């Protein structure tokens, strides 16, 4: 091989090594590593059996999650139950959050740049006695989306930390949702008032019980496909006298689930509902298990519905 090319290749190699070394040095100076991956929520992880409250402060709202009877509840919304998925994601964030780099103290301009100003999320964890375990201000994601800028209470420096931190930004988004989600294909009968639309099989159209008429109930079935809560009250805090007489709907599925919905309405497009679950004489094992594990989510609770869903169900009729 020509020695000239070997010399050129050698020079290029030296240059490459030099610039690579300079790049690593600059990174180490600008963002020196620190703590070796120490957990951000160390005290929280050490007190998992003694947690009491989690506070999530967002630019839009403050949400307090209180642990009662081993279940997390959203204090701002009737003390109703928080969603399993949301809580699981939150605790995964606690477990995954580790210090990656220390960036040093930040100026006011840096705080805005890193999202550690009014746009930040603040997470506070407390034990059962109310003592603060961890308080962390979480800002923007870094350019690679692998880390977030953060400030840890008691520290002046800004850190890069690992973790997802895609928190729900409203209290309602923390609730166990949806209240009800029934596919139209699963519904065997729908009773509204004194009339019942029923079918023996999915391929057969609905008929009004005792008649040959084919009712149009598709909009009711579609509304039952996703029923969500936008506010929640305990039975003792819900004044039924403030509403018109409720509309009663009973839905029965092919696998034996029976859902009775009482829908309350009043002026201003405000609709609330209560839900009760039972079974037919021969339900499937899955239905029995569902009722046993989920009945507490509905017993003595009233739920505010979205106006469009509430309007459809409150004005439902079969003819």
What are the residue ranges of the model-derived segments?
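Secondary-structure "cap/kink" motif recognition
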Residues: 1-319
